[in-house]
Amino acid sequence: MNRLLNEKVEEFKKGVLKAGWFIEKMFRNSISSLVERNESLAREVIADEEVVDQMEVEIQEKAMEVLGLFSPIGKPLLTVTAGIRVAELIENIADKCHDIAKNVLELMEEPPLKPLEDIPAMANQTSEMLKFALRMFADVNVEKSFEVCRMDSKVDDLYEKVREELLLYMMESPKYVKRALLLLEIAGNIEIIADYATNIVEVSVYMVQGEAYKCYHDELLLFKKSGGVLFESSD
């Protein structure tokens, strides 16, 4: 029974990771479509959102199968519940990649506003965060999990730099407003994807340690308050 349960949990986990690797590629393609002004790549990203939606459904079904047939406890239960949450975050990332690709198509209707520097830098950092987060979930090794908070802080700083620069463009001339707003929305979506990558790491830490940790600025700290909000503390 335990052997079969472990096999099913491992199969479930591999499915979550396949969805994660797919979303890594989807994110890279969304940014490449922006940098290269590649319409076909942007449309591919938009179409890929439905693939991720289907993946999430399959992951949920597999999770219900494992929970229903085996009623796991302990580590297997934590792995399945963590996988469900990671799949939700992957689907959220797919939504943001879809939004980036749609913005790219709109941007391509006009000449480039400016050379792209900080937005690709944000994207590169976020791509590293995604890779890092999925490796944490895959390896069940969260020793360096705190590093994701520092990476996220760098993305936040780059976003502020992009926002300030684009606001200057909007104040300079009305003809720049639409393109600046589209670029600002893209930067905002990249920043949100970085937050989702951070959430994946937080979920992985909970899966391994059984306690909730959250990023506060560039530190990963235990998230614990006295008493409860919905339920009384079991301490």
UniProtKB/Swiss-Prot annotation:
Single GO molecular function: protein homodimerization activity
Family: Belongs to the PhoU family.
Name of the featured protein: Phosphate-specific transport system accessory protein PhoU homolog 2
Function: Plays a role in the regulation of phosphate uptake.
Assembly: Homodimer.
Pfam families to which the protein is assigned, alphabetical: PhoU (PF01895)
InterPro entries listed in its UniProt record: P_transport_PhoU, PhoU-like_sf, PhoU_dom
Oxidoreductase is among the record's keywords: no
Compartments where found: Cytoplasm
Gene responsible for this protein: phoU2
SUPFAM superfamilies the UniProt entry points to: PhoU-like (SSF109755)
Organism field: Thermotoga maritima (strain ATCC 43589 / DSM 3109 / JCM 10099 / NBRC 100826 / MSB8)
One cellular component (GO) term of this entry: cytoplasm
Top-level division of the source organism's lineage: Bacteria
GO biological process, any: phosphate ion transport
UniProtKB keywords: Cytoplasm, Phosphate transport, Transport
